[in-house]
């Protein structure tokens, strides 16, 4: 394991800067994440979908420690990678670059994969108009969305000169709710773990020139009207249940 890489230039020192949260009342779980993944999957009937929205270190270690979990995973829908430009290096997206070797383990595991990468998530650009829409939806969820995304828009402008910021992780949940809202294409995807400018790149064989069987459904486009409608529905739904 190498030294942890963080994106505090985008998400702040806490990883979730912007909102002001109340003091924590829940303690951290005593069980290690890798053991929890293994135990949970081994006790399942193969009906669990994993949705990692960060580096794949824990899942990769679990796969290596207990290969018997592989047939227990119905699917992995992950936020990470790109078939175009990266966002942490010119070649690599942050979640994959943070642990390319772990990503390689996952992408070669044989488990059904859906890669929701930057090419798709960058289509969900959150603008001040979107923030205002969620504020109008009201309640603590609308306020939380506003606090997080106003901070994100600030850092996106400071770092990249962009007037808006994408909402990456929620697209994975959107895919689970309605796969038809996201167009995917089956491709062979390989993670570059060679030292150099392409380290951490998800090499996507879009045209099939390598002749290797596809191992990943890669997100191509998203119905943004549907997506923002879903986000607003969730914001309003929180008000009704709390």
UniProtKB/Swiss-Prot annotation:
Keywords: Glycosidase, Hydrolase. The keyword Hydrolase applies. Substrate binds at residues 156, 168. GO terms for molecular function: purine nucleosidase activity; ribosylpyrimidine nucleosidase activity. One of its GO terms (biological process) is purine nucleoside catabolic process. The keyword Lipoprotein does not apply. Its EC number is 3.2.2.8. GO terms for cellular component: cytosol. It catalyses: a pyrimidine ribonucleoside + H2O = a pyrimidine nucleobase + D-ribose. It holds the Pfam family IU_nuc_hydro. NCBIfam families: PRK09955.1. Belongs to the IUNH family. RihB subfamily. This is Putative pyrimidine-specific ribonucleoside hydrolase RihB. The gene is rihB.
